[in-house]
Amino acid sequence: MHFQTLLDETIGNMTGHTAIEYFVGKEKKKVSGDAYLTHIQAMTNYLNQRMQPLEPGTWVALKAPNSIYWFGVMFALMKCGYRVMLLDAQNPHQLDEHFVTEAGVKAFITNRPTGIPGVMDVDIAEVEGVDDQEILGDPTSYPPVGDDRWADKVSFHTSGTTGTAKAYVFAASAIVGTVRNVTEYWLGNDRITERRISPNLEEHKSLLALPFRHISGFLLVVTFWHMGHCVIFPPNSGVFSIIDTCKQENIWMMFCVPAMWKGFIRIAQARYGGCGEQEFQQLLGENLKVRISSGAKLDAESVKVLLNSGIYFLNSWGMTEIGTSTMGGIDEDPSTDYVGCFYNKHKAKILLEDGTYVDNGVGELVLDGHSLYESILIGGKEVFREGPFRSGDIFKLDGQRTYFLGRCKSVIVTDSGENIYPEEIDVYFDFLNDYSSGYCTAGYQDQVTLFVSPKDYDNFEETECFAQIRKVNAGLPMNKKVTKLYAFRDPLPRTGKGEVARFQMAKVLEERTDGVKEIKMKGRNV
């Protein structure tokens, strides 16, 4: 299978209908499925000439923010035969170089030139802005590209620095299979279908506030086209723009990360004095019937509020390596750990500490199935996955019900869905070796947290050690800043290797009721 199938079943499914609505200033514009397909062909013919002498099968990076024709550029590259790597537009230059080395990327379609020697840079605005009549009307200069070259692979990358970011490759059949599986779940869920406002699915507009290069944002857009829904672009990705668009354009479904939902809750409380059904209708409109949260875990307080919002709220779980995997209504189970049931035809097992696999219980979630990633790009070559995938996440499986309990790997997932690696943050605070008997950073309550046993515990906040912590923290990127600090009178526990036992910190906090200081770093200008 090639990505022609995905195009045919998504944008091709919107012929005769509006596929996208967007804004130029305050003016709303529409793009039909027919017009989008025509523009894809024009961009394909243009790129076929522009990308010479790159051969079909070459990896090309699409590194640009969300835009109306972002998917069109991707499909045009694929129709030329190029395998596409989807990158964050904000990635630093070092990460671009990393993927050139590790993935063999030969060109970037981007809004910011990389300037990497020997690598082609193409401005995405140049591609998106081609004139359909000019390109399609000049077959001599821009020979038509047929359907005989379609690419069969796409790559998504994980968060991290140059040493941890990985490029995961998915076969076209895995992506198409996922889209079909999600559609089957969606159309078979009576709680969703009974909330339709019209027989015309085009009127059920969907607003998605995730970057398209993110596997969740990618899959949701193509899935809603697959089901016949119009996708609407807000004027910008800010929370107030999303609120205004949702209300004014009668959005029916919205997909966001937990951080965005928490923002809506705060704004509803500030504007209307509450977060009940009436307040949410005032904030987001009466047509919003279905909401989805994914990318990170919803906190218990948000779940409590959202249960009373009068809108069907779904929680979803997935990873870059597996795409989307589970989904379920937050009102279907009293546990805030509940993330629904498997619906992407994954085969799931629990790996216990003794190395045995069971169908039910608590342990590391292990998945297999066709819709997982196929390979990783390392050193310019594909290293293929062998056997099931160990997620690194602790789950409880109880029949068809799934409960996400936390991470057994060190990565911290913020409520915006971003991966933060504590080992990287530890390096910034290595001066603590001179001021303490031990320290580490870890994820605690979805926050970047510093644990330290200072030599001067009693006067810790007046010491040079604490002043240096504040100074270093102030210079860190916003997403890596420590937001909470725990100082311990007694030494921190260590592993058999003599390292601070990062994974035991949550348990240590529960057990040590004395000799612990909690210091919130927010509001300290750090």
Protein language model annotation of sequence segments:
Residues 412, 470-526:
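Conserved C-terminal "lid"/linker of ANL adenylate-forming enzymes
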Residues 20-53, 61, 65-67, 94-97, ...:
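Conserved AMP-binding/adenylate-forming core of the ANL superfamily
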Residues 32-34, 153-186:
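Conserved AMP-binding A3 loop
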Residues 46-91, 207-210:
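Conserved AMP-binding/adenylate-forming
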Residues 179-205, 212-279:
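Conserved AMP-binding/adenylation subdomain of ANL enzymes
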Residues 341-342, 356-387, 401-402, 416-420:
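Conserved ATP/PPi-binding loop(s) of AMP-dependent carboxylate-activating enzymes
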Residues 108, 369, 392-480:
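AMP-binding/adenylate-forming catalytic core of the ANL superfamily
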Residues 252-256, 266-334, 436:
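Gly/Ser/Thr-rich phosphate-binding loop
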